[in-house]
């Protein structure tokens, strides 16, 4: 629908390859940037220690392949990408990559580094035939603010590089509470080379949301209220596109539910309600109790480890409410965990504008390369670079979105919200931009787009509109025109 900024970025990289044809190091950078354009969107999962990053990553993928214990592999940046056959590759800081054995224990992927120390590993790359990785490459990062300076430094170096673009196109940032350290990281992320492009490409997740209400059945309702409050926070709003509450453990276990999990919850559902509630006052009491008959301590310990008390309570309540098979229960638990909303946001905020985010990263990477290159090389590319940045509408949308979220324009709150929506701040499909249902007809879409176009055109023509707001109006107008052009080209009746 919009100007193909990714085509312009690819053309610019071809030109850069000609300019740097005798510089092997620069050509390697250009090749890497071209690979980013051609590959799937890269999303890093970041957060403080014990925020639940690996658990959430497993939930998104739909398989337990990311280690969630406190082992040495959680201290390494690990890439998860789609592959036709399972494969694990260790990339050391010094030396050649080496293949690691692919092994699973109790359904989980096990990483065995052999004699290699975690601090000597630059990254692990896991190729896995998971549908959830077809259009995404997910990057698991060590915890920020770890007591170990080495662990924390790895994440900082990867997520906040000083002179190069970040290796990820977007970030899912997990927080349990809104602390100053979370804001400091997100602010630093925005100030990296990628962030200086004037974009907002972080999505916050209120993680372990089931623990907010002490495991009560209404915990996620309380979490949703808190997430909504955080999303309006004036300190967080300029740094993240939204806040989504997710019970990561519940989401992971729902996506990987076993028949034995369902059968164990069925046994609990048949108990007397008061007896069951007394039994579930604590995890230790639940595991050690002799009742119910037919459910041993090992089975109960597995349930607690996989679902937590909140997940068990919710699963039992759903079974008592009429759910009678594990597939239906898994779908409902995943939906209630908040995973569905997160996946929807990833799709609407990141995947639908993946080309723009990848092109933006390539342009920023080329800018970084030129800063450290001989002046004659920079001069040969600077004009083309500036032309692309000025003409690619996707880049202008991303920059305006960042400006709108910082409150840097003299627009009313209502107009700011509308502009943010029209430039794709809540999703880049035409219905989402126009606030319509996903099933809206082309006629409804063109009618709504025309109304928006006329409203913003009047504002642009108003002599009292300030220059900065006028620039914003022009970007919004171009977005509306893009929608109209795309839908006017459709055959009648579609």
Whereabouts are the PLM-identified features?
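Short, flexible helix-adjacent loops and helix caps
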Residues: 18, 65, 214, 354-355, ...
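C-terminal end of P-loop GTPase domains and the immediately downstream helical coupling element
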Residues: 203, 212-215, 221-393, 397
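Charged, amphipathic alpha-helical linker segments immediately N-terminal to NTP-binding catalytic cores
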Residues: 1-21
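N-terminal J-domain/J-like co-chaperone modules of DnaJ/Hsp40 proteins
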Residues: 395-494
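Globular "head" domains of long coiled-coil molecular machines
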Residues: 34, 38-281, 336
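Short amphipathic alpha-helical coiled-coil/interface segments
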Residues: 30, 366, 385, 473-480
